[in-house]
Amino acid sequence: MDGIMTNGSSEAHPPMPPPEPIERPPTPPPPPPEDSALPPPPPDTSAPPPPPEDLPPAPPPETEPKKKKVGWGTKRPAPTPLSVEELVRKKREADAAAAKPKFLSKKEREKLALEKRAQEVAATRRLKSEHASNGVDRSATHSPSVSSEGPNGDARSIPTGPRAMRNSDAAPTAPAAMRHSQSHNKNYDLAPPPPPKSMSFGLTSGKGDSRFVDEDEAAAQAALVKQRYMGADQTSNFSAKKKRKRTTDRKFNFEWNAEEDTSGDYNPLYQHRHETNFFGRGRLAGFGDDVAESVAHKYARALEDRDREAGSIRAREILEMERRRREESTRNQLDKHWSEKKLEHMRERDWRIFKEDFNISTKGGSVPNPMRSWDESNLPKRLMELINRVGYKEPTPIQRAAIPIAMQNRDLIGVAVTGSGKTAAFLLPLLCYIAELPRIDEFEWRKADGPYAIVLAPTRELAQQIEIEAKKFTGPLGFNVVSIVGGHSLEEQAYSLRDGAEIIIATPGRLVDCIERRILVLSQCCYVIMDEADRMIDLGFEEPVNKILDALPVSNEKPDSEDAENPLAMSRHINHDQHRYRQTMMYTATMPTAVERIARKYLRRPAIVTIGSAGEAVDTVEQRVEMIAGEDKRKKRLGDILSSGEFRAPIIVFVNIKRNCDAIAREIKQWGFSSVTLHGSKTQDQREAALASVRNGTTDVLVATDLAGRGIDVPDVSLVVNFNMATSIESYTHRIGRTGRAGKSGVAITFLGNEDADVMYDLKQMLMKSPISRVPEELRKHEAAQSKPTRGFSSKKNNEEGGGGGKVGW
C-alpha cells in the first residue's frame, strides 16, 4: 500500500493490521472543512477497534494451522511461577493412568486410526512441499508483491513464506529474474540450503522398490567405500601366536584363518539359508536303515513267492543293492564310538582310533584287524568255554592284535612290555592249530616222531610258569604238555616223554642236549614259539637256538613269497597230506641285532606287532631314583623303606653279584622280615621252593639277581628295589617289569652311584618318557647323563652273574 500524504509530506506510521471482513456501522460524513481551517489530523491508528463478539469461528486449516504473526495486536500471557507440587502430582497421575489398562471402543479405535492416517498424510505433504521449495524458494521470495516496507514506507516484519505460494497456485509464466528485473538482488535469502537427507547405500527412491539394508550392512558397505578411497587401515591384525598351517602338495593353505574371510555375501537371502527339517528318527521323514532294510527283505520275499526263477534272481539283486547302500551310509557314520558299533559297521577310521586307544601298531602286508572282544576272536566254542572258566574277561592289547594274526597261520614278531599277557597270546592260537592235527597217541610211530610244537624260554622258571599256564587249557582238551629244563635228570624227562607230547616247553640248552643224545627228535614239529627272545640272546643262547631251528624239518617250511601272507594258502595241507606249513612266532621286549638276524633267517614275511614302544617301561610303574654311594648307606636306606610300612609284601630286591644276595638277605632278616634268595648257584629244587614261598605269602622279600628279572611272574609285587643298578637299560626294564603287571600299579626304587655312569643317559631318557616318574636333579645335572656314551660290546656284561648266567637254562 502507498503511504498517506499530508501537506505534501509523508509521515511514517506503524504497520496496519490486515483488513478484517467486518461490517462497520455507518457513520455520518464529517462536515466540509472551511477554507481557512486546518485539515483534520490523521486518525489515530495506535489501537484497532475491538472485534465484535458475535463473529463466527474461523474455518479450520486445510493442512496445518497458520502461525500467528507477532505484532502490535498480540498479548503475551502473564508469567506464572511453576509449582513443583503440581508437577509432581500431574506426573503421578499420568504414571498411574499409564499403568492402568485403558479400554477403547471400536469408534475410538477408528478415530485414532483416522487421526494417525491424517498425520501421516500431512507429513507426506509437508515433505513434498519442502522438496518443491528447495528449487523454487530462492527465486520466488523476490516477488514485487512482497515488499519490505509497510503501507507508509515503513519496514515490515519478515514474511513466513513466499507470497506467490500463499496467494496463488498458478505456475509462473516466466523466470523470476525476468519478472522482477528491478529488484533482482534485493533482500536475497541468504539462509543456507537444508542438509541432504541421510541415505543408506543400496536404497532407491522408486516407489516399487521395497528392499532395505540393515544398519550393520550399511556400516559394512560404508567401511568398504572408506577403505577404497582412504586406503587400508594402518593397524596390523597380525598375531605372532597364530598357528601357521602347513602347505602340502595336495592342499594349499592360505595365511589367514577362516574367520578372516571377507567373501561373504551381503544379501540376507544367502546369509540365512533355509535348513531342512528332519522328522522322525534316522533319515528324512523317519526312514532309518532298519526300516529300509526290512522293507527290502519284504519286497525280496514277495518277488520270490511270485516267481521262483526270475523273482529269486531279482530278489538277490535287490538285497545286494540294499547291502551296498547300507555300507555307503555307514561310511559317514561318525557319531558313534567304536565300542557301540557292530563289527560290519567298523570303518578304517574306527580301527585307527581303536589301535590308538590300546597303543597298537602293526607292520607287514595283509595284517588283519585286531579283535575288540573274545567273541570276535573266532576261537572254537570249547576253547571259549575254557577262557571263561579261567577268568579271562577282556583281552590285553597284545592278545587283541596277535591272536587274529596267528589264527591266519602268519609268522609273527610280537614286541611288548613284560606282564602284558604274551603267554595266552601264543598259547590259544597254538591249541587251535594242533587241534586240527591227528592225535599224537594214535600210533606208536607218531609218538616217536616228536612233538607238534616247541616253546623256547630263556630260564627254567619262565618255562615252568608257561607249563602251568598251558595245563589250564591242555588238560580239558586232552593234550599232553612236558617241560624240559635243567636241574632235573635226563632219565626223568625221557620217562615223561614215553607217551608222547603235543607241546614241549624247554630251555635252549637242555633241549639241545636231548636232541644230541637222541632222546628227542623234531621230525613232525610244525609250530615254534620263542618267548623272551632277546633275553635268550643276552644269556648266550644264540647258538643253541640256531641248532634247534636247524633241526626242524624243511618239508613244511613256508615259501618266501607272497603266499606266506595268504591265509588260505597257508591253511592248506601240504601235498594232500596231514602235514601243514610250519608257523614261527617270536615274542620279545626289545629288538637287538641278534634277534633281528634270527628273525630274518627263520621267519617268512612276518607281521610285526608292537605294543607301546620297544624297550620302554610300562606306564603303571612309578620309577624313583636316589643317588646313594656306598653299601652301608644303601643298606640303611633299604631298611628305612621296608620299615616305613608304605609297601606290602611281596617285595623283590635286585643285586648284581651273587654273594651280595645272602648278605642282604641276612640284613633283612635282622630287621624282622622273612627273605629268600634266588641266583644261578641255587639248585632247581631250591629255586622252586624259593618262588613257591614268595607266591604263597610265607616270605616277604625275595633277593635275586637278573635271573629273576625275566619271565618270573610273582603276583601282586608292590615294590622293586634295585640295590645295584643294572648294567644295561634292557635289564633295568625287565627288573622293574616284575611290578605293575596285569594293569596294576607298582613302584621301582633304584640306588644310583658314580659307577653307573654308562646307563645314566638311557635312564634319564626313560624317566623323561614316563608320565608318572620324575628325574632327580642330581641325575639331570650329572655329566654322564648329558650324552650317550660309546661302549664296546665286551663291556656290556662285566659282572659275575653274567658269567655264570649263561648256564641257567642248561
Curated annotation (Swiss-Prot):
It holds the Pfam family DDX23. Residues 14-62 have a biased composition (Pro residues). This is Pre-mRNA-splicing ATP-dependent RNA helicase prp28. Residues 1-10, 141-150 have a biased composition (Polar residues). A motif (DEAD box) lies at residues 531-534. InterPro entries: DEAD/DEAH_box_helicase_dom, Helicase_ATP-bd, Helicase_C-like, P-loop_NTPase, RNA-helicase_DEAD-box_CS, RNA_helicase_DEAD_Q_motif. Residues 801-810 have a biased composition (Gly residues). GO terms for cellular component: cytoplasm; nucleus. Residues 86-95, 105-119 have a biased composition (Basic and acidic residues). Component of the U5 snRNP complex. One of its GO terms (molecular function) is RNA helicase activity. Its EC number is 3.6.4.13. It comes from Aspergillus niger (strain ATCC MYA-4892 / CBS 513.88 / FGSC A1513). The keyword Transport does not apply. It is found in: Cytoplasm; Nucleus. ATP binds at residues 416-423. Residues 620-783 form the Helicase C-terminal domain. The Q motif is unique to and characteristic of the DEAD box family of RNA helicases and controls ATP binding and hydrolysis. Residues 403-609 form the Helicase ATP-binding domain. Residues 1-210, 778-810 are annotated as: Disordered.
